[in-house]
Amino acid sequence: MAIHLYKTSTPSTRNGTVDSRQVKSNPRNHLIYGQHRCGKGRNARGIITAGHRGGGHKRLYRQIDFRRNEKNIYGRIVTIEYDPNRNASICLIHYGDGEKKYILHPRGAIIGDTIVSGTEVPIKMGNALPLTDMPLGTAIHNIEITLGKGGQLARAAGAVAKLIAKEGKSATLKLPSGEVRLISKNCSATVGQVGNVGVNQKNLGRAGSKCWLGKRPIVRGVVMNPVDHPHGGGEGRAPIGRKKPATPWGFPALGRRSRKRKKYSDNLILRRRTK
């Protein structure tokens, strides 16, 4: 991802950036469908359960091939496109049997490159194969948790995991969060890192661009009224009035672990993620 600055012609473009490699192309009709983004942070009763969400431009969902079911059939990258539903780019693949599918864009892949998925395929960027066929130290993304379900881990822009050990029926992975966990060696993954690495360095430049993405303003609890937040109230710039910060619903915030204590994957996690 190449970040370039706008010319400072207006206040909104003074701090804005643009991705020069972003390609505008119409998505394929048989690979998209409309979706009704109901709720937008509300539950079934209309109460806000996830803040700072709402509005935004209409989106068409692109069907991404997370399973990589085209085994031992070579495909060619035709386009690298923007996807409004994720911060990673996607690329359109034309396979030798006539199939056309979207996959996550691997970092460094360009138009014209060939990819393939299978059991005995080269360790090359963009190729998908089981963990048992990969050497130790391989950088991977789009990792399956359940065999045949499709990739679920390391799918965000710039995400990459590392295969650090294989023993018995399990493989040990170090995930982007720093967590070390076990996964079946028969599960598949894609070689390489997800593209669009510099997305976190992109500056939208103005509030309107943020609203187009469906993200609403973030308001501090200390400037609210007591009815709206436990930190609210007081005369002028008052402190929060309690020993530890809290969420809008009164639960401890900022540092309290929220993971469930009894989960099926507790025995598979060798080391918890790091902050």
UniProtKB/Swiss-Prot annotation:
This protein's record includes keyword Chloroplast: yes
Domain of life: Eukaryota
Main localization category: plastid
Protein's cellular compartments: Plastid, Chloroplast
Listed GO MF terms: rRNA binding; structural constituent of ribosome; transferase activity
Polar residues bias locations: 7-26
NCBIfam families: rplB_bact
HAMAP family in the record: Ribosomal_uL2_B (MF_01320_B)
Assembly behavior: Part of the 50S ribosomal subunit.
The protein's name: Large ribosomal subunit protein uL2cz/uL2cy
